[in-house]
Regions:
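One-carbon transfer enzymes
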Residues: 1-210
Length: 210
């Protein structure tokens, strides 16, 4: 069976990347294979995770390359050299242009640490999301996996999972619970759905064929 060739994009520690690797090694992504990790930072711990698991990694730094255009050209070169069919944004802090997302239309997915459309879009990333949820006083938060388009966090939703907020939560505690109870579960599941061709996109919505 030919497996879908996956690239995972990261910017930091790579905990979601590690969750994907573990899922792959445990046979939970039978239709896909992670063949490349792209980091936007040369100091990201995710690079060590890739090395530990024998996964090829490259660093594409917008700061070092000097412009969005050169940044995306370098990424595209690596994607094409490795015949990438699916891109997974797993804590990737750089915004991709409309031209880039169009080139890989319906082949880029992202994990976001809230129940979209709450606490998403420009400025909502990392701990900021959980700080906003606690400040608003919502009782339930969670995570969302969605198709990436030109609108930040605006593409069709593939999967969501809710997580209850507890009375003494801090942004850090909530972030950890959302990762453990939601992100690390629905991201590998969504990747497998994409790789197996079960996700159908129609009129801005997704439908999963079992």
């Amino acid at each position: 069976m030919l497996k879908t060739r996956i690239a995972v994009f990261v910017s930091g520690g790579g905990t979601n990347f590690e969750a994907l690797i573990n899922a792959q090694e445990n046979g939970k992504i039978p239709h896909g294979e992670i063949v490349l990790m792209v980091s936007s930072s040369k100091t990201a711990y995710a690079l060590k995770r890739a090395e530990n698991h024998g996964i090829k990694s490259v660093v594409c730094s917008k700061k070092e390359l000097g412009s969005q255009e050169r940044f995306e050209e370098e990424i595209l070169k690596n994607l094409e050299e490795n015949n990438i069919q699916l891109i997974v944004l797993a804590g990737f802090m750089s915004i991709l242009s409309k031209e880039f997302t169009k080139k890989y239309e319906n082949r880029i997915i992202n994990i976001h640490p809230s129940l979209i459309p709450s606490f998403c879009g420009e400025g909502f990333y990392g701990l900021h999301v959980h700080e906003a949820a606690l400040k608003k006083g919502v009782k339930v938060t969670g995570a969302t996996v969605h198709i990436v388009n030109e609108i930040p966090d605006g593409g069709p939703i593939i999967m969501q999972k809710a997580v209850y907020i507890e009375e003494n939560d801090t942004p850090e505690i909530l972030q950890k619970r959302v990762m453990e109870q939601a992100e690390w579960k629905i991201l590998p599941e969504s990747v497998e759905l994409m790789c197996s061709g079960k996700v159908k996109i129609e009129n801005g919505r997704t439908y999963c064929n079992e």
